Amino acid sequence: FIQSPSDPYLITLFQKKIDAFSNLSVDEKIAYQKRNEAAITGYVLPAYETLIKGLTELLGKGQNEQGLFYFPKGQAFYEYLVKREVGDSRSIAQIEEEIKQQLVADYQAIENRLQTASHTASASSQPSAAAASVSGLSTAALPALTFLSDISTDSITSASFADDSTDAVAMLKDLRKKISQDFPDIPAVSCEVKYIDNSLKNYLSPAFYLTPPIDQYTENVIYLNPAENCRGLSLYTTLAHEGYPGHLFQTVSFHAQSPAPLRFLLAPGGYTEGWATYVEMYAYSLWDGGSDATVVQQKNRAFSLGLAALLDIGIHYHGYSLADVSAFLTKLGFNASGASSLYWAILQAPANYLQYYVGCLNFQHLRSTMQQALQEHFVLRDFHTAVLDAGPAPFSILEKLVAQKLGVTIS
């Protein structure tokens, strides 16, 4: 960020945005640009230099370079973190067991689809038909997953888009049209797709939704990272996660109800990221109607997230080291070279993967509960409406609100 103090992106991006603003004179634009540059060079850059100096002095003084498990009361803090960030009040053991069961189910679904699909990997790369099991990081016995590398989302074409399509705007329109049957109407809003500046491409995710101000939710922006080369099915489901019916859709729906501002601060990530992941999985069926190849990709995506969530618990609650993670991934057939980056990503953000994956599992469980209670009277659109009307909340509270909305008695 400060390696090129004469050309940091906070200056160049501001200049571009001001130049594009039509309601200012040339002199006014220059004045604003000079004020911004003075603030960046006079305050922001020196502040970063001070931060760097302070952090450098702390290097080597850390008492723990592993998970929360190794801190005093680290396990208790992780339990609290999961309850707060995910909104799941179950014990870690219960959550962990559900993750394992879902991993097995997804793996078996992948096996079944690959065995029946005519355009999958060669026979030599097919997985064994042996039953899969996950009994823990140290004794996991899932068959190898290397066969999944033979399948590319770039070869899965929908009726509306080419397999290498990068038309994000058209995909968002397609998603908004196709979800109308299963999701409620929301106020008309704008959504602009932008691409991040080249100076940020190495530091940001493939895409992100920029949460709008609470008093201006009708103008929305989704940023894409061109460095990720996201296209086809991968781009489509990413846009479902960030846009329709994901973050943008949920955010606009909630804002339109004019909730108390405090609720924006109390929203657990398990609801927001769990919802976005839940509808991302839903969107796979919208791409081509649910072919075997698409279902395999959906299950593979879910399996990958579940694996990361299981490792999150392993690292922070059970105290697994980088060597443990590497051995675990190797046993599953993954390249151990990626273990280090995954380990450090999980280490820096405890319970983060659980927000996505366990949040998604909670929505799937809630949907299943309502379906069982309502039987033939269950309507998916009504369920989604009840979830969105309730807004972000811990799942124990959300279940009560949704049940009340749908007229279901929870024992």
Residue ranges and their predicted role:
Residues 1-411:
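N-terminal maturation segment of proteins
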